[in-house]
Amino acid sequence: MTRTRGFALALVMVAACTAAPASETAPEPNRSPESPTAVLPTGPTSPTGAAPSPSPVVQEGRTRFAGRISAIPMAIQREMTDKTWEPGCPVALEDLRLLRFNYLGFTGDIKRGRMVVHADSARDVLGVFEQLFDARFPFKNVDLASRWRPNGPIDTTRSKTAAFNCRPALNPDLTPTGTWSEHSYGLAIDINPLQNPYVAEDGTVLRPAAEAYLDRSQDLPGMIHEGALVVRAFAAIGWEWGGHWSGKKDYMHFSLRGR
């Protein structure tokens, strides 16, 4: 009896040691939005001004859109205060939202951007940037706006795509109009300002570097054209394009009230 029981126990132990799941692969670790980015292949642009289509990338990083909406963290509030927001601005910080999302850079790499918009438009705006990511529309840089200085220089060379910035609306000569810009409410976005410049009624631009983009028949990365997905996607959420203005044109500018 003892020998038989011992033999049976040995068989059970052998079976337990040899049995295994169908796969021994360790589970894929969860990746945070700040994981290392994937680098996509580069090449000539398409006729729509989009970056080249990539081969599937399965290494580190994300090849599909990822974005999130949050209240403005204290660290970002400190970064904004006395630069792009201050007491007396027409919208309170608690009425703004921080968007974090990945976007396609001009060299085909996937980057992580930050943008502050009004809470009421946050979900719609994030949806637009998801469409643009899927269509491979590239951005030079997406980040929080820089400080506005009255009569100071406007830097378009970095071509930063940005939204909220508490400042007045500007006349063609860059002097304040006395009313708030829609950027002050988080209800306006400037996209690739160098590639999509503000053009005065006399055809001049604010920076010599933008003159290379005055010919809007060109189809260069990051440029916005009539009927393009960028224009249609913003129109679908009720935002208007400055390229539709009569006289002056603000090709970079999208806003809820068309100002």
Predicted segments with their positions:
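Mid-length scaffold segments of soluble, non-membrane domains
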Residues: 136-140, 155-193
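Active-site acidic/histidine clusters and adjacent loop/turn architecture
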Residues: 91-157
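Catalytic cores and adjacent binding grooves of peptidoglycan-active enzymes
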Residues: 58, 174-259
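Compositionally biased intrinsically disordered regions enriched in Thr/Gly
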Residues: 54-104, 109-114, 181
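Structured segments of extracytoplasmic/periplasmic soluble domains
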Residues: 104, 127-138, 167, 194-197, ...
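N-terminal low-complexity, Pro/Thr-rich disordered segments
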Residues: 17-78
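Bacterial N-terminal signal peptides that target proteins for export
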Residues: 1-7
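Bacterial N-terminal signal peptides
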Residues: 8-16
